[in-house]
């Protein structure tokens, strides 16, 4: 459904009055070259709109202008959501976790750092 909305919003991009686009799990079932192409396209789309994208795909996260980590936990019977902006090493750690499932691998850190350097549109 998110990809259908991406297609519709892309066609209407220059004619609609929506300033914010939100995509939840747009990366479901994709990876590799398609994930990289989606990341490049989302960057292009973000030049004209504010784009918020919930993703679990490292290649899509590496393309972001800004990277946030959202977590939920239960405290005293209530669900509490926290949002943290990730910068520099924290961002590398999270992209490494998305790549390998564990951020402790030096190989995943190296790959994550390379992806961010290659695909991120600029310094945070």
Q: What feature does the model see in each segment?
A:
Residues 1-21, 45:
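GG-anchored amphipathic helix commonly corresponding to the ABC/SMC/Rad50 NBD signature/C-loop
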Residues 11, 28, 75:
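Short, glycine-/Ser/Thr-/acidic-enriched flexible segments
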Residues 15-16, 28-36:
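Conserved D-loop-proximal element of ABC-family nucleotide-binding domains
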Residues 24-25:
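Walker B catalytic acidic pair
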Residues 33-124:
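C-terminal lobe/lid and adjacent interdomain/linker elements of RecA-like ASCE P-loop ATPase modules
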